[in-house]
A protein has these predicted regions:
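Conserved class I S-adenosyl-L-methionine
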Residues: 61-70
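Conserved SAM-binding motif I beta-strand of class I
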Residues: 84-89
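Conserved SAM/SAH-binding beta-strand->alpha-helix loop
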Residues: 91-93
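Conserved SAM-binding loop
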Residues: 98-99
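Conserved SAM-binding strand-loop segment of SAM-dependent methyltransferases
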Residues: 105-116
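A short acidic, Gly/Pro-enriched loop at the edge of an enzyme's catalytic core
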Residues: 119-128
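Conserved beta-strand signature within the Rossmann-like core of class I S-adenosyl-L-methionine
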Residues: 152-160
Length: 208
């Protein structure tokens, strides 16, 4: 069981990568991310987010969706744990690298080159939806993800937050909150930098 906590924080920051500045929410710019992923530098880590690792402990593997999968670090981890994984990203290069890594590891991974606006989440199709460092949550997202998840399915979210403190919570009032943070902390892929980060693990209520 995760802790539920609300933490006051002070600042937000921009992450600076080897090819320039990244403004979160820019994931739909495929040409930009193709350039980032094509540098040959190890810009992003390949291990999964700690939040996701903890979120699936004790859960039976099922169908998982990784929104904005990038190079596939979370998708590949889930596939290694026995989940049936679909991931998508608008970056052809990111998806290519994810497919390549999965193949080398002998893993089955459905990796698609598509933007979020063109991907049909479906209805009661997923046991897990993951969205890390893609964009900020919008008010209508909670309903969309609830429809797409099966009963007791979970949504795992992590991103920089430049909005109001704890605003994310009001979008998920009907959900069971397993973990929440809105903190000034280090990113898991840039531990030397302090960023304002929000993390959420929420479970869809069982069908009545």
């Amino acid at each position: 069981m995760f802790r539920f906590r609300r933490t006051l924080l002070v600042t937000a920051a921009l992450a600076v990568l080897g090819v320039g500045q990244v403004f979160w929410g820019q994931q739909d710019d495929s040409s930009y991310w193709n350039k980032v992923y094509s540098t040959g530098q190890t810009i992003f880590v390949h291990h999964p987010t700690e939040l996701l690792v903890n979120a699936i402990k004790g859960r039976r593997p099922g169908a998982a969706l990784d929104i904005g999968m990038g190079q596939g670090r979370n998708s590949i981890f889930l596939a290694q744990q026995g989940w049936e994984v679909t991931g998508f990203d608008p970056s052809e290069e990111g998806v290519r690298q994810a497919r390549e890594r999965a193949a080398k590891l002998g893993l089955h991974l459905r990796a698609l080159v598509v933007g979020e606006e063109d991907f049909d989440l479906g209805t009661a199709q997923w046991d897990l939806i993951v969205m890390t460092y893609v964009r900020r949550i919008r008010p209508e997202d909670a309903g969309r993800f609830a429809r797409a998840l099966r009963p007791n399915g979970i949504f795992v979210y992590e991103n920089n937050n430049a909005g109001k403190q704890n605003e994310l919570l009001k979008y998920f009032l009907a959900w069971r909150i397993l973990h929440f943070e809105d903190v000034d902390t280090s990113s898991d892929w840039h531990p030397e930098r302090t960023l304002r980060v929000e993390r959420l693990v929420a479970e869809k209520p069982p069908a009545e």
